[in-house]
Every structure is written in structure tokens, then in C-alpha cells.
A protein has these predicted regions:
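Alpha-helix N-cap/start motif
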Residues: 23-24, 91
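Terminal transmembrane helical anchor/hairpin motif
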Residues: 101-178
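Transmembrane helix boundary and interhelical loop/hinge segments in multi-pass membrane proteins
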Residues: 1-17, 31
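Residue-level hotspots within the lipid-embedded alpha helices of multi-pass solute transporters
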Residues: 3, 38, 70-74, 164-169
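Secretory targeting signals
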Residues: 29-93, 106
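Short cytosolic juxtamembrane segments of multi-pass membrane proteins
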Residues: 181-185
Length: 185
């Protein structure tokens, strides 16, 4: 949440906005920096995949598609966080707004299960991930629905890829619009 909120708080956002960089370049640069940092952390977790291959014979498909899905999920959540960070100079406000958006996108499955017809179908289309519980003995803590479930099963779905890329693009665009509006205030 420090990506843009800290810049606003310290007054360095004005320096960035008066530089020859366009707002899109600033937002995209901060997004790529956060995504690379996240991918380094994901890369460090590949140690566990190595241990799996040393002590067993796992199926490589779900492992690789899980990493692809995790990358796409991370890009979507980072874009939402960057947008929330652009809205306020307070990091806590950015955290609350970003968490609220992500929670809303996650619990859509819970809400849509209690609806029927077109409303349920529309809400299912906007679900970020599956709401699952470690206490649910039927799912064993694995997402059974949502856009991430196919990646966890080893299936690459163009619909799921397009969804995560769309969420990422929409929230990056909204972040650019917030910064452009700030310039004109």
C-alpha cells in the first residue's frame, strides 16, 4: 500500500508528476516493480517444488499452471492495491479500500450461490478467487470454484487468463485516471 500513498504523504508524487514521465509510465513502473518483487518471492517458493521432486513424483501440470495462475492472481491483486494506494495519502486507508475491494471480489461466490438466474451468473463472472475454508472437509482447503480453480487443477483456461488480465488492466487504468485527476486539481 506504500506504492503511491507514501509518495503522496512525503510530497514526492508532485516531483514524479512534474517529471517528463506520463502518468501511465509512472503507474506501470510501480506495478512492474511490485510484480517483480512478488515473483521473486514466488521464485523462492520453488524450493518446495524441488523437494517434491526429490521425495516423490508429482504431476508437473498442476504445478506449472498453479504458478501461472498465481502470477495472474498476484498481478490482479497488485493492480487493486495500487489503485487503493492512489486514492489516499494514508496507507491504512489504502489497505482498507484495497482489502474491501478484494474481499468483495472474493465473496461474490458465497453471495451468488444464494441467488438464482442471471444475477448469479453475472456475479460468478466477477469472482476473483474461490472462497474456501480449511475447515471444509469436502474441499480440503483447495479452491473448488472461481477463476483460480482451473489453474490449481492443471487446466489453462483462456477465460480465466482474460479475467485476471482484465482486472489488472481495469485497475491500472483507474489508477492512471486517479493520478491524472490529481494533476488537474
Amino acid at each position: 500500500m506504500r506504492l503511491l500513498a507514501e509518495e503522496q504523504k512525503l510530497g514526492t508524487l508532485e516531483l514524479l508528476l512534474t517529471s517528463p514521465l506520463r502518468e501511465f509510465e509512472i503507474v506501470f513502473g510501480k506495478f512492474i516493480a511490485a510484480l517483480v518483487t512478488t515473483m521473486v518471492m514466488v521464485g523462492l517458493s520453488l524450493y518446495f517444488v524441488l523437494v517434491l521432486f526429490v521425495y516423490g513424483d508429482p504431476d508437473i501440470g498442476p504445478l506449472l499452471t498453479g504458478l501461472v495462475g498465481l502470477t495472474l492472481y498476484a498481478s490482479a491483486t497488485l493492480a487493486v492495491g495500487l489503485f487503493a494506494s492512489a486514492l489516499s495519502s494514508n496507507q491504512i486507508v489504502g489497505l482498507v479500500v484495497g482489502s474491501g475491494i478484494l474481499t468483495t471480489l472474493t465473496i461474490i461466490d458465497f453471495v451468488s450461490a444464494r441467488l438464482s438466474g442471471t444475477a448469479a451468473q453475472v456475479m460468478d463472472a466477477f469472482q476473483l478467487g474461490a472462497s474456501f475454508s480449511v475447515f471444509d472437509l469436502d474441499s480440503f482447503g483447495v479452491a473448488e470454484g472461481g477463476h483460480f480453480a482451473d489453474f490449481a487443477r492443471g487446466i489453462i483456461s483462456v477465460t480465466d487468463i482474460a479475467y485476471y488480465l482484465s482486472i489488472t488492466a481495469v485497475f491500472l487504468l483507474l489508477t492512471v485516471l486517479v493520478l491524472e485527476a490529481r494533476r488537474w486539481r
